[in-house]
Amino acid sequence: MLDFAVNVRAGSPPGWLTERLTARLAELGRYPSASDERRAVEAVASRHGRDAAQVALLAGGAEGFALLAGLRPKLAALVAPSFTEPEAVFAAAGIPVHHAVLPPPFALAGLARTRGADTPGIPDEADLVVVGNPTNPTGVLHPREHVLALRRPGRLVVVDEAFADAVPGEPESLAGESLPDVLVLRSLTKTWSLAGLRVGYALGAPEVLHRLTARRPHWPLGTLQLEAIAAANAPDAVAEAAAGAARLAVLRTEMTAALRALGLHVVDGAAPFVLFAVPDAELMRKHLETKGIAVRRCDTFVGLPGNYLRAAVRQQWPVLVDAVTEVLQ
């Protein structure tokens, strides 16, 4: 199966990272050490120019969403279409959710400030707002000033930057900003092909991070996770990720142009995936499956019409485009 549905960059981590993890296997009989945790925290802090107290290590960016319910917001506003995990977390905790649905082209500039519960804007009473940048599944990269415009007194803005390191230069990232009311969640899973290990981190004010992690058990991350976080945030690794992001951007441009040449609408974005509309998404997806190609269905995302599909940016994109062409003909 040629998998365009999952946004992990490669089938396995790079050799040097695998070697570092393998070298720690003999230590798995011991609990993770404080020095390993400190080394990982310091690597993240150094990368983003933050104080160590502003870093919380996570078992994947998704754990950050799972912990948000512990902040007990009165009303959580989710900028949609977006990653579905936050809604599931808040719903399970009985926390009211408001979907602030962005109309095409899915830019924050199209989000009006409103108070009505059934309107597309963000109610003033929302004391927690979640926004992706770049957003999954649209791939749209919002200007940082538009994200910061979501701030209000008494409100925490949570920015999902799971795909930020796939954007060349990370120009709109808030990871390096020390703001008391902005919490940034980052993932290392996609770029470093570590979906089976679960690694990420949160960046925010120490008080916010304390509340976020207050109910976690001891040793929430294992030795291999801590090693991976330290390794992936070292200067050489950051440079390698940046080079990979530049290559992905070229592939994305080529892939987008090819899909548009078929007469398809492709959303302008900067993520390592593309969102495009087809006349019949279910028919298209089933045809692609017969060709051994998987893409992501999008009818599960709030605010997104069912005729959209999402496909990861891969070197094999011509195979996908050829298969799509067969259906359109």
Language-model-derived ranges and their functions:
Residues 248-249, 260-291:
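Conserved PLP-binding catalytic core of the aspartate aminotransferase-like
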Residues 37-40, 52-76, 84, 200:
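Conserved beta-loop-alpha segment that forms the PLP phosphate-binding cup at the N-terminus of a helix
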Residues 1-32, 46, 116, 125:
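N-terminal "arm"/small-domain region of PLP-dependent enzymes with the aminotransferase-like
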Residues 5, 275-280, 291-329:
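Conserved PLP-binding active-site segment of the aspartate aminotransferase-like
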Residues 98, 102-168:
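Active-site phosphate-binding strand-loop segment of PLP-dependent enzymes
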Residues 69-91, 96-103:
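Conserved PLP-anchoring active-site segment centered on the Schiff-base-forming lysine
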Residues 19-60, 251-252:
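Conserved N-terminal alpha-helix of the aminotransferase class I/II PLP-enzyme fold
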Residues 13-14, 38, 181-259, 264-267:
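PLP-dependent aminotransferase class I/II
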